[in-house]
């Protein structure tokens, strides 16, 4: 028996891939909130807020109820939650983890992981080496936690992970949520 412990080759998205289509497909498979569009001058927090606002995952006007909502009340608070500056050369694994990892239960990441890694690499290339990447914590990309898998919420979900990138005239938002 000849077993190979070599990692498989990277998933090939094809020549000149439509990253928006691939991102949407992975998001559909993994139930993620995603946005890929032009950089229209919004900052990371405002962009994240605007993408999340129509989802029902924000409660900006709540502050007096007994539920104890934990998410941000404004784009400024969302910006403060996105406090981890991810170097562009490290953004691809953050993207892939946010696209596929279950935030509540550890386990299988499914067959879509190689595609998510390819999409992450493609998005990093699209936004370029000068892109500004931000994340709200290490609940998805646990490898970046350095001992503490903490996060600052960007939604009202029990668990959430967000990666937001702006660069080269493009902007991307990827948000995962989980409930236990």
Language model features with spans:
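N-terminal "domain-start" segment
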Residues: 1-113
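Acidic, proline/glycine-rich low-complexity IDRs
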Residues: 110, 114-180
């Amino acid at each position: 028996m000849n077993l190979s412990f070599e990692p498989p080759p990277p998933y090939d998205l094809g020549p000149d891939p439509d990253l928006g289509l691939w991102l949407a497909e992975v998001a559909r498979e993994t139930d993620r909130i995603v946005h890929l569009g032009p950089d229209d001058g919004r900052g990371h927090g405002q962009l994240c807020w605007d993408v999340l606002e129509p989802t029902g995952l924000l409660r900006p006007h709540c502050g007096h109820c007994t539920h104890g909502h934990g998410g941000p009340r404004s784009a400024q608070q969302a910006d403060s939650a996105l406090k981890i500056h991810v170097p562009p050369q490290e953004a691809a694994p953050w993207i892939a983890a946010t696209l596929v990892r279950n935030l509540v239960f550890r386990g299988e990441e499914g067959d879509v992981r190689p595609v998510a890694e390819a999409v992450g690499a493609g998005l990093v290339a699209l936004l370029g080496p000068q892109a500004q990447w931000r994340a709200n914590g290490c609940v998805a990309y646990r490898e970046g936690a350095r001992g503490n898998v903490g996060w600052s919420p960007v939604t009202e979900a029990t668990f959430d992970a967000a990666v937001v990138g702006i660069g080269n005239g493009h902007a991307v938002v990827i948000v995962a949520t989980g409930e236990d």
